[in-house]
Amino acid sequence: MTLKSLRIGCVKYLNARPLIRGWPGEVTLDHPAALCAQLARGDLDVALVSSFEFLRNPIYRIVNDISISSAGPVYSVIVAHQGEISEVDEIELDPAAETSVNLLRCLLSESQLNPRFTRTSASANASPARTRRARLLIGDQAIRFRQEHAHEFRFWDLGEQWARVVASPFVYALWLVRPEVIDAKIIADRLRALRHKNLANIDKLIGEEKDFDREFCVGYYRENLRFDFGKEERQGLTEFHKRCVKLRLLARDGLGFGTWELELARRCV
């Protein structure tokens, strides 16, 4: 399998640009939920997808040293609300979201909050209709909504809330490789080299950005996001796994959490 023939998918958001810009072959760009489904069906060989996809279906290999993560406010994973977050009784979930929905459930449980959840396919520009109603937004939609409605809404930043209760970073997305792909290490090395090149030339990448202004991109890439997947990120993902099992968002797999962390490290290529 050549790199150009590889069936590769990537989330279609600003946060993924440093991880995919310059890939030599065709790339399927889509929302997290759609990419997870395509990868699970075997329609893709490799994809940058929600970290929750690995937690619920740990058949994949993980490209080591690369993730989309944060160790504080992430800016682009938010609950838009009016009034106090404790007063919200209904949250509309972004149908494109995977990891963020379950992160939200974990954080609400931590805060002892229990609003209803509804699914919506409405545009992000459609505002929550009343004070006790809120909406989960992710990716570029979240960025635009924050910038366009900064004076109308309050924003519960899920990265910031995670950092308040967990010392390790939160991992939103990982490169996952299907188990039948035989040259996973070669692919992983190429993706790591691409990430390194793009981050080393981040000013050039920002200068080519057409959807968001330079000042925002500089802060977003350098302050909000992290692109590593090392020991700290594995600890964060292990903590997320533990909390999802506790809330029965994931089935117990029979492994102790210490053993699971070792298995996670073993899956990296």
PLM feature spans:
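Domain-level signature for soluble enzymes in the chorismate/prephenate branch of the shikimate pathway
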Residues: 1-269
